[in-house]
């Protein structure tokens, strides 16, 4: 199978601009599996709950999932991408898996980082593994974790024990340790991993977060 990630710098709170930026790049990719960063439609460093509410969407009914579905169908690829999810009055830092058939699955980030727990609920769906196929019809099992989930060895181990062959890892990494650790996660669990990080900077109340990029694909 062929796998790819798309690394870019999302514009804070501009969903339309971020979808356009991805659309301009993703259509040139030729891969069975494409992974996008965490919160790719919204940016990360939310100034308030009102800002988050402005960009959060239901999954799979939201417009961003619809865009992902369009790309998955037109590219004949499975996509994994991070989105701010709204369910009623609750918000989750989620990843959506979209297949070329249009079928969607959701994972909600379990291990929240820094100030995320002031806005998002911890994920309540557990670590999930999904049955997918390559465009040649070869089946494989796809696990998903989001950003800081990498820090806890049990996350990748749980996915591996559930039968994952590949772990997709949408991220917004600001600390330098993950790129060194993901090869270990792949090796110790005998899985392939794909970390799709973003780059750029975001500011809030005089504090700046610098996202490190350094997306990577690791083998066992």
Question: What do the predicted segments below correspond to?
Answer:
Residues 1-5:
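Extreme N-terminal starter segment of soluble prokaryotic enzymes
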Residues 7-9, 37, 108, 197:
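Residue-level recognition of beta-strand->loop/alpha-helix junctions
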Residues 7-25:
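N-terminal phosphate-binding loop and adjacent alpha-helix
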Residues 63-78, 151-220:
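CN hydrolase (nitrilase-like) catalytic-core segments centered on the catalytic cysteine
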Residues 24-100, 106, 175-189:
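Cys-nucleophile CN-hydrolase/nitrilase-fold catalytic domain and related Cys-dependent amidase chemistry
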Residues 78-82, 108-115, 196-200:
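Short Pro/Gly-enriched beta-strand edge/turn motifs at strand-loop
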Residues 57, 86-162, 171, 177-184, ...:
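Active-site catalytic loop in hydrolytic enzyme cores
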């Amino acid at each position: 199978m062929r796998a790819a990630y798309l690394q870019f710098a999302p514009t804070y709170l501009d969903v339309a601009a971020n979808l356009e930026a991805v659309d301009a790049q993703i259509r040139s990719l030729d891969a069975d599996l494409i992974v996008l960063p965490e919160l790719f439609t919204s940016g990360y460093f939310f100034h308030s709950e009102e800002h988050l509410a402005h960009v959060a969407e239901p999954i799979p009914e939201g417009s961003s999932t619809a865009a992902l579905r369009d790309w998955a169908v037109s590219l004949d690829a499975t996509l994994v991408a991070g989105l701010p999810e709204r369910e009623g009055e609750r918000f989750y830092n989620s990843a959506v898996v979209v297949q070329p058939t249009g079928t969607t699955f959701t994972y909600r980030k379990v291990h929240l980082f820094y100030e995320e727990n002031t806005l998002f609920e911890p994920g309540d769906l557990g670590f999930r593994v999904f049955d997918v196929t390559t465009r040649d019809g070869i089946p494989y099992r796809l696990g998903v974790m989001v950003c800081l989930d990498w820090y806890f060895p049990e996350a990748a181990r749980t996915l591996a024990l559930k039968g994952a062959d590949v772990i997709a890892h949408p991220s917004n990494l600001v600390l330098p340790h993950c790129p060194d650790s993901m090869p270990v996660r792949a090796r110790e669990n005998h899985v392939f991993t794909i970390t799709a990080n973003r780059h750029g900077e975001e500011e809030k109340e005089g504090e700046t977060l610098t996202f490190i990029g350094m997306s990577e694909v690791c083998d066992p």
